């Protein structure tokens, strides 16, 4: 009697097909079962799937975790704790951005060849309001779990599931091969931290950067949270986090029709220069961005003074302001995962971000905190 071959769900990016025979040979060598529905799906998924593999000559700890980059000179004490969890699935009924399967946004590449500043129609503005409200709910769900002992991978699971519950696609998932559904940046990590198995510790700070896609629109927001009472009692961290929060608030207060995009950086750096108790610097490598039907588009919003960003705010435009400030100098390095950005000094960094809609008289903070949102300024 013939036996029926057991069916598995394909491990490929954005694929929910059944798979039976084809397995990743590297996973087989590591004793891991990962099935794919075909060679094309395996090839398309490789840039993310490879993060699940333990590099040769890397020893596992007793708990099965390991540092995938043992020869890299990390600037601070933070190191990645692998293996990463398997790629999380998105149900097929949820609408996807154009890069969900390939990792490459062709629509963003086309837009990038021209400097177009889109002004949304009233209907499109409602689409942005909806996705940003959902984004706030998702961020708050993750923030409620921030405590010593929670891993950043657990935060990723919370964000992913909260997105799915709201019929949203997590915008970071497979965006140019980013392997997770949220960015979690701890201590000296400036941005784009990949969630892994490291538990948060009392005294850490963690930035949770949520981006999601709903009914054709992206929303984007982040906040930095204190982990435990030890962090809240650290004067360096409090100075850094609270001044980053204030710098964003001051920039938002200046958003109105007719303001040059370059002006927001002047406001942010003027505030950081006024801080006398600590040296705090503005990161120049990363900037805010336009956002609408595209995840990233024009305009660019640098956060430092005397920048040359072109363009003027007009009613109907939507964009983010998301300053990253560091203790000490602002030079940054990138980990070998090609995503994680760390301060070169190993000192801590903080960030806050909102998505904004320019109105006739000022702006609307589409991702504004709710009365019961976790975190917030220290009293």
From Swiss-Prot:
Zn(2+) 3 binds at residues 209, 220, 353. Zn(2+) 1 binds at residues 10, 15, 37, 41. Binds 2 divalent metal cations per subunit. Has a high-affinity and a low affinity metal-binding site. The true nature of the physiological cofactor is under debate. The enzyme is active with zinc, cobalt, manganese or divalent iron ions. Has high activity with zinc; zinc cofactor is transferred into the active site region by the zng1 zinc chaperone. It catalyses: Release of N-terminal amino acids, preferentially methionine, from peptides and arylamides. Zn(2+) 4 binds at residues 220, 289, 322, 353. Its main location: cytoplasm. One of its GO terms (biological process) is protein processing. InterPro entries: Creatinase/aminopeptidase-like, Pept_M24, Pept_M24_MAP, Pept_M24A_MAP1, Zfn-C6H2. It is an enzyme of class 3 (hydrolase). Keywords: Aminopeptidase, Cytoplasm, Hydrolase, Metal-binding, Nucleus, Phosphoprotein, Protease, Zinc, Zinc-finger. Its EC number is 3.4.11.18. Cotranslationally removes the N-terminal methionine from nascent proteins. The N-terminal methionine is often cleaved when the second residue in the primary sequence is small and uncharged (Met-Ala-, Cys, Gly, Pro, Ser, Thr, or Val). NCBIfam families: met_pdase_I. This is Methionine aminopeptidase 1. It comes from Schizosaccharomyces pombe (strain 972 / ATCC 24843). The gene is fma1.
